[in-house]
């Protein structure tokens, strides 16, 4: 009856294709337009819009093998044969088409005729009130009554709050008496390993209302799920999912890397199983564009990687190793998931970087945790403070469940409430900081608006408008007018001025009345739907109730619009070239330039930068219309508009659509046609934080100015080098480099001669202390390289020499001491000597027994410092003799 995992998967999908089902590939682990889920955790999860009637399915019968991640039982992974965070779910689904009869009879047909499982070892459960299912199992399938178990709501009725729900039927396999607990009561539902549930058929036939009343659905649905790993274990006759063919290959690779043999040590086996499970989930998550972070699904990934890394250390693997398993995982899954092959190197890099980062802090964190656990044990306490757990999380990158797991191994529990409190406080601080950065710059102004006033923004359609002054604030107080020279905040009933928001800076321009003119310096969103114009009155006065002409600086706005639309093109290009993980982390759009932060784990290559620039410029040259669509949020998401993960949107949103190249939710201002951007040029690419890169770029006339400046610089270089053409510049530079290298070698020779000459003088003036020669070099110089060279030459020439440099540099003294290992054996300790000598100089110093350095500010004590060194060295040699 043996069947490989790949064979089972393919036979299942082919079987349901033969029953009129459309085979769909596995969906991404990242839920699409479903904020209720962090990660896809069931076969039906990506199909929810079809079940809920929000979207029309491509066919009313669908079959899939869906990759899934579940982490609620992460603490149990490795300790049991069944628990895993990553798994594949086989499923067949009906959206108002067939129902119980087909679902049950086809399931039985597949299990008995395709998998050929012995009928006498199969059992089923049904919901206790589901007589329809009983009749089908008993009369249609022919299963004897004793093998059909009626179970209660807790076991055999699927529902989540209100909405679609229904009874379910589960199929079990009897693994035999020898796998049971031996109790007379052993049967379906027993916690032992004898009866294994492997297929759940859910009959969604009711709609539960808020009063708890069940109404029959007009078009009932079918949702089934069979765990691939679980059925593979049955078909391959093994006791654990870690023993099935594709998982065993990964497990064996881990054993090879760590040098551990599976099955010889129960504690090591747990660690091997943890790594085996977590590396599978990790590979698929990174492959789907998730990057490690401290939030959301990125945090789930970080937990898996760091937990696996810690278990690697428990197996004696202290260096990074997880990336070495990636090829084996891809080899195991390349048939159903060929996309992993091209993503292999990328997955390895992300894994290596994350594990390396954790390795930098894990030892310090483990020491802190172990010391705290020892203290608790000594005091006969068993609760680790939330403050310690939070410090491990915040400072050393320990996910909470990792701390909890390590503590539990020692019989210690973690103060979850204390940890949660500190986490909430940190989130609140971050939320307040973000809030201050967003729309409420007015809070720094300390103004209060009592009346119901509102500013209508008309700046999408026009750059100038007639308006009326509603309020004026000066020095945080409401005033009736502002005179020449005053800086004030003006609220209008309508304005074309864009207020700083979403990374785009505010417009600038002028406000004009019959009696005055004000220059608009900044614009912010204020309270109660107002827009605050920070303005300086440059002529006459501006008064409340004045009719006013508001005029935006056209050139600055146009430059900003070019940069903002270019930012969208850049974002889309990054995701196309680097991968879907390269999502926006922050941005700044201003007239002079644009700045874009995005998720990525390594610097961009020169080739990637050129490719990104070319892609953006190609779209610019195509002069594609830029559509601005106002719609509700749900409609925008259904259109496929990109929404920033952490951004909060109102119900009515603006979609910026650029052909089929880019579509994002955005409230900023944009050009009407990509051709208006002119040109796009990346001027820098750098790191902002771990896993976040930054691109700065320019557009339009700024690119032309950039090119002119570069031409001028190039011309100056050509003239300086006396090159006849630009192409000769590199050759001239190569010649200069060769000449400099030759001169540096010549200089090094002269420096060595000078050092050797000085060394001879110093050696002759040195003190003989026992068998050792103490050479004291007192001089004034800034050439520290020269001093180090002299020191090295002393040690090269004479193993019995001890050298002490006392160097005067401006108003400070530098101490550098070195000796041979032979001198160390005789009692010399440069570290201790330099420490004492530096105290004489009013400073600090130290180092190794054979090399140390330090300094101080009391340069007048250099002679005393030399005398102190002689005393210490004499004492050490004489004491060691």
Curated annotation (Swiss-Prot):
It is found in: Cytoplasm. It catalyses: tRNA(Ala) + L-alanine + ATP = L-alanyl-tRNA(Ala) + AMP + diphosphate. Binds 1 zinc ion per subunit. PROSITE patterns: AA_TRNA_LIGASE_II_ALA. It comes from the Bacteria. SUPFAM superfamilies: Class II aaRS and biotin synthetases, Putative anticodon-binding domain of alanyl-tRNA synthetase (AlaRS), ThrRS/AlaRS common domain, Translation proteins. Its EC number is 6.1.1.7. GO terms for molecular function: alanine-tRNA ligase activity; aminoacyl-tRNA deacylase activity; ATP binding; catalytic activity, acting on a protein; transferase activity; tRNA binding; zinc ion binding. Gene3D superfamilies: 2.40.30.130, 3.10.310.40, 3.30.54.20, Bira Bifunctional Protein, Domain 2, Threonyl-trna Synthetase, Chain A, domain 2. GO terms for biological process: alanyl-tRNA aminoacylation. InterPro entries: aa-tRNA-synth_II/BPL/LPL (IPR045864), Ala-tRNA-lgiase_IIc (IPR002318), Ala-tRNA-ligase_IIc_anticod-bd (IPR018162), Ala-tRNA-synth_IIc_core (IPR018165), Ala-tRNA-synth_IIc_N (IPR018164), Ala-tRNA_ligase (IPR050058), Ala_tRNA_ligase_euk/bac (IPR023033), DHHA1_dom (IPR003156). It is an enzyme of class 6 (ligase). Zn(2+) binds at residues 564, 568, 666, 670. Pfam families: DHHA1, tRNA-synt_2c, tRNA_SAD. Keywords: Aminoacyl-tRNA synthetase, ATP-binding, Cytoplasm, Ligase, Metal-binding, Nucleotide-binding, Protein biosynthesis, RNA-binding, tRNA-binding, Zinc. One of its GO terms (cellular component) is cytosol. Consists of three domains; the N-terminal catalytic domain, the editing domain and the C-terminal C-Ala domain. The editing domain removes incorrectly charged amino acids, while the C-Ala domain, along with tRNA(Ala), serves as a bridge to cooperatively bring together the editing and aminoacylation centers thus stimulating deacylation of misacylated tRNAs. Catalyzes the attachment of alanine to tRNA(Ala) in a two-step reaction: alanine is first activated by ATP to form Ala-AMP and then transferred to the acceptor end of tRNA(Ala). Also edits incorrectly charged Ser-tRNA(Ala) and Gly-tRNA(Ala) via its editing domain. Belongs to the class-II aminoacyl-tRNA synthetase family. This is Alanine--tRNA ligase.
């Amino acid at each position: 009856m043996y069947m490989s995992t790949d064979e089972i998967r393919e036979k299942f999908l082919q079987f349901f294709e033969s029953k009129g089902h459309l085979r769909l590939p596995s969906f991404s682990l990242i839920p699409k337009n479903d904020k209720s889920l962090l990660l896809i955790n069931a076969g039906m999860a990506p199909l929810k819009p079809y079940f809920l009637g929000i979207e029309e399915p491509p066919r009313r019968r669908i079959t899939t093998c869906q990759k899934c991640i579940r982490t609620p039982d992460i603490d149990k992974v490795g300790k049991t044969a069944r628990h895993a965070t990553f798994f594949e779910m086989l499923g067949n689904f009906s959206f108002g088409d067939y129902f119980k009869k087909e679902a049950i009879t086809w399931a039985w047909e597949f299990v008995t005729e395709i998998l050929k499982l012995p009928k006498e070892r199969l059992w089923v459960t049904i919901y206790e009130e589901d007589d329809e299912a009983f009749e089908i199992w008993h009369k249609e399938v022919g299963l004897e009554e004793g093998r059909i178990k009626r179970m209660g709501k807790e076991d055999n009725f699927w529902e989540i709050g209100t909405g679609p729900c229904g009874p379910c039927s589960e199929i079990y396999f009897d693994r035999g008496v020898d796998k049971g607990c031996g109790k007379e009561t052993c049967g379906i539902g027993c916690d032992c390993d004898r009866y294994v549930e492997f297929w759940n058929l859910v009959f969604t036939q009711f709609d539960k209302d808020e009063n708890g009343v069940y109404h029959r659905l007009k078009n009932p649905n079918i949702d089934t799920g069979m765990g691939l790993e679980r059925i593979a274990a049955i078909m391959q006759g093994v006791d654990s999912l870690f023993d099935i063919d594709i998982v065993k290959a990964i497990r064996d690779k881990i054993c090879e890397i760590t040098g551990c043999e599976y099955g010889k040590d129960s504690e090591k086996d747990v660690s091997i199983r943890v790594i085996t499970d977590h590396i599978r989930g990790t590979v698929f998550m990174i492959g789907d564009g998730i990057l490690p972070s401290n939030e959301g699904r990125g945090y789930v990934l970080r937990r898996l990687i760091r937990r696996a890394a810690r278990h690697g250390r428990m197996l004696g693997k202290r260096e990074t190793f997880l990336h070495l398993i990636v090829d084996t995982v891809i080899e195991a899954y390349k048939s159903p998931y060929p996309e992993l092959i091209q993503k292999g190197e990328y997955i390895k890099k992300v894994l290596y970087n994350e594990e390396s980062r954790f390795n930098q802090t894990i030892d310090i964190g483990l020491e802190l945790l172990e010391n705290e656990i020892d203290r608790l044990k000594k005091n006969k306490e068993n609760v680790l403070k939330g403050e310690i757990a939070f410090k491990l999380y915040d400072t050393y990158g320990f996910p909470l469940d990792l701390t909890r797991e390590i503590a539990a191994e020692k019989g210690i529990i973690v103060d979850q409430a204390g940890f949660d409190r500190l986490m909430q406080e940190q989130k609140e601080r971050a939320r307040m900081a973000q809030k201050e950065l967003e729309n409420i710059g007015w809070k720094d102004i300390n103004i209060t608006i009592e009346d119901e006033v509102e500013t209508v923004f008309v700046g999408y359609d026009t750059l100038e408008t007639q308006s009326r002054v509603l309020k004026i604030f000066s020095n945080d107080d409401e005033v009736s007018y502002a005179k020449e020279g005053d800086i004030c905040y003006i609220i209008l009933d309508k304005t074309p001025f864009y207020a700083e928001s979403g990374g785009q800076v505010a417009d600038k321009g002028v406000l004009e009345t019959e009696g005055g003119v004000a220059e608009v310096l900044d614009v912010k969103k204020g309270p109660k739907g107002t827009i605050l114009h920070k303005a300086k009155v440059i002529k006459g006065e501006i008064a409340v109730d004045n009719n006013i002409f508001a005029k935006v600086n056209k050139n600055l706005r146009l430059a900003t619009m070019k940069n903002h639309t270019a930012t969208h093109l850049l974002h889309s290009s990054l995701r196309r070239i680097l991968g879907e993980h390269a999502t926006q982390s922050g941005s700044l759009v201003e007239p002079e330039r644009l700045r874009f932060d995005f998720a990525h784990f390594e610097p961009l290559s020169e080739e990637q930068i050129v490719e990104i620039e070319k892609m953006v410029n190609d779209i610019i040259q195509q002069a594609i219309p830029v559509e601005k669509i106002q719609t509700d949020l749900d409609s925008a998401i259904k259109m496929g508009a990109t929404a920033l993960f952490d951004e909060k949107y109102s119900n009515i949103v603006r979609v910026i659509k650029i052909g089929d190249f880019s579509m994002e939710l955005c409230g900023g201002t944009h050009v009407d046609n990509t051709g208006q951007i002119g040109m796009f040029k990346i001027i820098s690419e750098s790191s902002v934080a771990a896993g976040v890169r930054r691109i700065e770029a320019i557009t339009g006339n700024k690119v032309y100015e950039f090119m002119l400046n570069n031409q001028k610089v190039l011309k100056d270089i050509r003239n300086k080098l006396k090159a006849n053409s630009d192409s000769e510049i590199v050759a001239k530079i190569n010649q200069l480099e060769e000449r400099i290298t030759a001169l540096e070698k010549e200089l090094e020779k002269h420096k060595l001669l000078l050092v050797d000459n000085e060394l001879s003088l110093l050696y002759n003036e040195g003190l003989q202390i026992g068998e050792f020669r103490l050479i004291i070099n007192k001089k004034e110089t800034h050439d520290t390289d020269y001093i180090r060279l002299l020191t090295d030459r002393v040690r090269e020439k004479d193993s019995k020499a001890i050298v002490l440099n006392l160097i005067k540099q401006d108003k400070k003294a530098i101490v550098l001491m070195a000796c041979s290992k032979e001198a160390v054996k005789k009692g010399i300790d440069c570290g201790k000597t330099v420490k004492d000598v530096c105290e004489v100089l009013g400073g600090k110093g130290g180092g190794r027994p054979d090399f140390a350095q330090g300094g101080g500010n009391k340069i007048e004590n250099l002679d005393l410092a030399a005398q102190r060194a002689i005393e210490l060295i004499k004492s050490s040699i004489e004491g060691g003799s």
